[in-house]
């Protein structure tokens, strides 16, 4: 019985403490306006949980900064979008996270909204494989 209790506590600890911010593979839809369709590519981005709290008493002298799982370092990769018209620029550059951390969301480079469009959104409605 003690083994079962230990296993249960270990699983709870693992779920709470170890689901930290880390690199994960995702599929995103990329689109070029000149090409009029989207393609899916695989990339690496940050996902996970960060310790945060929402204070009951909001102290205006001390801002409450919520930490999110975001990139610490990233690189850019470029792909050629196949099937574009010959006169169109068919190169697309996208970010690839190489290191993650829990930090303040930088709205200059990241969608910090509660509900963004999502990585598979395509404004043209047509996905090419």
Curated annotation (Swiss-Prot):
Main localization, broad class: secreted
Swiss-Prot/TrEMBL GO biological process terms: follicle-stimulating hormone signaling pathway; G protein-coupled receptor signaling pathway; regulation of signaling receptor activity
Glycan attachment positions: 25, 42
Disulfide bond annotation, renumbered to this chain: 21-69, 35-84, 38-122, 46-100, 50-102, 105-112
Subcellular location: Secreted
Pfam families: Cys_knot
This protein's UniProt keywords: Disulfide bond, Glycoprotein, Hormone, Secreted, Signal
Keyword Signal: yes
Signal sequence, start to end: 1-20
UniProt keyword Disulfide bond present: yes
GO cellular component terms, semicolon-separated: cytoplasm; extracellular space; follicle-stimulating hormone complex
GO MF, one annotated term: follicle-stimulating hormone activity
SUPFAM superfamilies on file: Cystine-knot cytokines
UniProt cross-references to InterPro entries, sorted A to Z: Cystine-knot_cytokine (IPR029034), Glyco_hormone_CN (IPR006208), Gonadotropin_bsu (IPR001545), Gonadotropin_bsu_CS (IPR018245)
Family label: Belongs to the glycoprotein hormones subunit beta family.
Subunit-structure text: Heterodimer. The active follitropin is a heterodimer composed of an alpha chain/CGA shared with other hormones and a unique beta chain/FSHB shown here.
Function, in words: Together with the alpha chain CGA constitutes follitropin, the follicle-stimulating hormone, and provides its biological specificity to the hormone heterodimer. Binds FSHR, a G protein-coupled receptor, on target cells to activate downstream signaling pathways. Follitropin is involved in follicle development and spermatogenesis in reproductive organs.
Name of the protein in its database record: Follitropin subunit beta
Organism: Gorilla gorilla gorilla (Western lowland gorilla)
């Amino acid at each position: 019985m003690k083994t079962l209790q230990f296993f249960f506590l270990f699983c709870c600890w693992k779920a709470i403490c170890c689901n930290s911010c880390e690199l994960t593979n995702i599929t995103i839809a990329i689109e070029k306006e000149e090409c009029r369709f989207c393609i899916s590519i695989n990339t690496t981005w940050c996902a996970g949980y960060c310790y945060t709290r929402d204070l009951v008493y909001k102290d205006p002298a001390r801002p409450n900064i919520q930490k999110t799982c975001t990139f610490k370092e990233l690189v850019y990769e470029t792909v050629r979008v196949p099937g574009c018209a010959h006169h169109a620029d068919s190169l697309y550059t996208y970010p690839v996270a190489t290191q993650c951390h829990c930090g303040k969301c930088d709205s200059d480079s990241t969608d910090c909204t509660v509900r963004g469009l999502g990585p598979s959104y395509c404004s043209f409605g047509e996905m090419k494989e």
